[in-house]
Amino acid sequence: MNKLPHETRVVIGMSGGVDSSVAALLLKEQGYDVIGIFMKNWDDTDENGVCTATEDYNDVIEVCNQIGIPYYAVNFEKQYWDKVFTYFLDEYRAGRTPNPDVMCNKEIKFKAFLEHAIALGADYVATGHYARVAYMDGEYKMLRGVDDNKDQTYFLNQLSQEQLSKTMFPLGELKKPQIREMAKEAGLATAAKKDSTGICFIGERNFKDFLSNYLPAQPGVMQTLSGEVKGKHDGLMYYTIGQRHGLGIGGNGDPWFAVGKNLKENILYVDQGFHNELLYGDEVIATNVGWVSNKAKEKEFKCTAKFRYRQEDNKVTVQIVDENTVRILCDEPIRAITPGQAVVFYDGDECLGGATIDEVYRSGKKLDYLG
């Protein structure tokens, strides 16, 4: 027998932002037994000695007091360092462009936090993510959030049946302007707080400065694939495939873009033109595959895929190589497919799962210059 809301304990992860504040408010209004948890994943004292986590936690305290729910802070710094930040540095060291948000959701928010919540007697965990969970045909499905502009299933692609069975996304049916309005109407302390952007542990800091604290920069040559030297780069880790800004190449003609990396010789490859053929791939090998249903649909199937967060859906055919690897054949060549990033699969609104981009091909030839 299903429990009534007031008998159902929901532990919600609260960041001190407007989204998780409204998610907590909605759960409370729906009658659930709600506990707010602030996750401290990073020691983020800035140059002025101000710890933004302290400010965020103070906002959580204020909102929880306004809503009338208990709150706690939990420190996951060690798990975060071991599972997310170490991966982040390893990928950059290997010349790739990682996606720490995907790893954070997999290892921290829906693993360490979920385990902690269950220890607190939780029936469910909740977050302020823009996504939906539906139980259909005997399994849990993850659907895109109604707000196309804010949908976050791309970052949640590694969640499993077990995790989804214990997860609530109260904002999934709402759009951002509605959430701001609800926060305002309820007089929540976070109603006008601006959204956080970028990688959580970098915050407002300069990316180059931050990364150089952990990985020594190794400047090198910037050249075309044919060997024409165009300048110097500050370190391969500071550049991603398709990047235009920060190259410092002047002159006439089309703008210059980073098109590849040679890790062995520490060369950044560049070329001209947004639609330069060197930036396009039509086949991908991806590893670390995770399926929301815990299994692939078939050995080969058609669906759509996103190769980065802010991207239209692309029609693809997915071929299962083994339980950890897929081959993705794109209907049309796609620009700036980047090793290390997530590729996420969809069937309409349903997120099927995702994987990590490993190798990129064009017309059957591996693009070795991608690093």
From Swiss-Prot:
For the region Interaction with target base in tRNA, give the residue spans.
99-101
Per its UniProt record, what Pfam families does this chain match?
Answer: tRNA_Me_trans (PF03054), tRNA_Me_trans_C (PF20258), tRNA_Me_trans_M (PF20259)
Q: Which cysteines are joined by disulfide bonds?
A: 104-200
Checking InterPro entries in the record gives: MnmA-like (IPR004506), MnmA-like_C (IPR046885), MnmA-like_central (IPR046884), MnmA-like_central_sf (IPR023382), Rossmann-like_a/b/a_fold (IPR014729)
Q: Which UniProt keywords apply?
A: ATP-binding, Cytoplasm, Disulfide bond, Nucleotide-binding, RNA-binding, Transferase, tRNA processing, tRNA-binding
- Per UniProt, ATP binds at 13-20, 39, 128
Interaction with tRNA: annotated segments: 150-152, 308-309
The record's subcellular locations are: Cytoplasm
Q: What does this protein do?
A: Catalyzes the 2-thiolation of uridine at the wobble position (U34) of tRNA, leading to the formation of s(2)U34.
Instruction: Give the record's family classification.
Output: Belongs to the MnmA/TRMU family.
Q: Which HAMAP family match?
A: tRNA_thiouridyl_MnmA (MF_00144)
What protein is this chain from? tRNA-specific 2-thiouridylase MnmA
Q: Which organism is it from?
A: Bacillus cereus (strain ATCC 10987 / NRS 248)
Task: List the gene name.
Answer: mnmA
